[in-house]
Amino acid sequence: ENLKIWQVLQHDGQEREAFEVACNSLDIPVFFAASSCRNLCVIRSELAVLQKRGKEVTEEELIQIALKQHWYEEEKGTPLKYIGKLVESFGLKVERRFCREINELFRELEQGHDVIACVDGGELSGNLEQEEFEDRWIGEIPYHVVFVRNIDYSVPPGVEVYDVAMDEPVRVYPLDCFIVS
């Protein structure tokens, strides 16, 4: 039921507009991370991995590959099961894990592996009031990905990510905020 509501909000302009009006009347700004970057968060995160690994490729080339392989749709983005397919298509090994243990993420980064994490983009924005509203009416849905670059062990600890939905894509989120997302 929650997924159906989310799909309506993503694809039905009139329903989404009504939702935004309701949110605005409650003074809750609407934040759709995936929509703000044309649903390219997966492609751009995989591009960052490929470029870090020395592969010369453009965003447009990756979009064309993903469209041809049916790994990406402009209106919907990239389904979870296809995250990493672009990286694999360039001969790099991808391991998919579905976990919520932050220690696993720490271990992967310490071993020099690249990590793309599925998150609730709104949780990262730090607007807890909006997120409580969204979680109640839409559900807790990880609809955005970030390329995790580093763990900052200072006090308080943080997670440095490349987040294409932000004006300044390289940013450090507080560790507790990242875990919740």
PLM region spans:
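Conserved active-site-adjacent core of cysteine acyl-enzyme catalytic domains
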Residues: 2-4, 61-181
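Active-site-adjacent structural segments surrounding the nucleophilic cysteine of cysteine proteases
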Residues: 1-77
